[in-house]
Each structure stands twice: as C-alpha cells, then as structure tokens.
C-alpha cells in the first residue's frame, strides 16, 4: 500500500524530478538544435546518459528563484533569462580558464546575436527565459499531480544514475 509522502519528501522528489527533466530537456534541445545547425547529429555533453548537467542546474535555479513568482509569467521569463544567462557565462568562463575545456562556443553557431565571448548569446538567453516559463507554468504543476510510489522510486533510481554518470564523467575523468 502506498504511504503518502510528507511535504519534505514531496519537495525532495519534485526537485530531483525538475533536475532530471531539465537535464533531459536540454539534451533533446541541443540534439535538435545542432542537427539543424550542423546538418548531422552530435552527441552533446560528456555523460553517458541523455542528460546535460548544466541544464539540470539551470532548471533547479529557475525553480528555486521563481517559487514566489509562479503566477507572474513576465517575472519568470526575466528571472530565468538572467539566472541561466549568468550561469552559462560563469560556468563557460570557469570551464575554459580553470579546466581548459570549452563545452560550447556561440562564436560559430547560427543565430548568435549578442554573443559575449562565445559563452552566451541572445538566442540562448531568450530560450532560457521561455524554458523557465514552460517549466514553471506547465511542467511543475503537471508533475506535482502525478506523484505516486512508482514515480517516486523511478525518480530516485534515475537520480542516482544521473549522479553516478556525472561523477564518473566530469569529476573522476
């Protein structure tokens, strides 16, 4: 029999789900975008699984920074654009200057207006804003209605796989 989760457990499961959905959504978005941009499929990221950790971080930032704004689409859009734009700029810069890794470079891509050092561009920032509105207005309300024991177990299993994949491919390598 399914035991109801308490509020803390619900929040943990929801946050893990947001992280996973955002990471997978980012992988799908980039796979489609680079197929269009380059004309062939490219496996994005260094993980084995179909997820990109920077999008997981972005999704979590969007959720945490917009909890109180969840009914204000304009605030969600602006907040998500700024938060994720800064995340992408800072992470891109640090990866290049500390680890000597460049995971993205908007200098060579289509629709790269407003490009800042290849780290961010207007297209990506606008996409993050729209993604934030989609996450807060559609995804979060939908997944909060779906909670049950099977989904909770699946969330934990996928969360552990995501963490293992991240640790092996970003930290240990």
Residue ranges and their predicted role:
Residues 1-173:
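Aromatic-rich, lipid-facing transmembrane alpha helices and their immediate juxtamembrane interface loops
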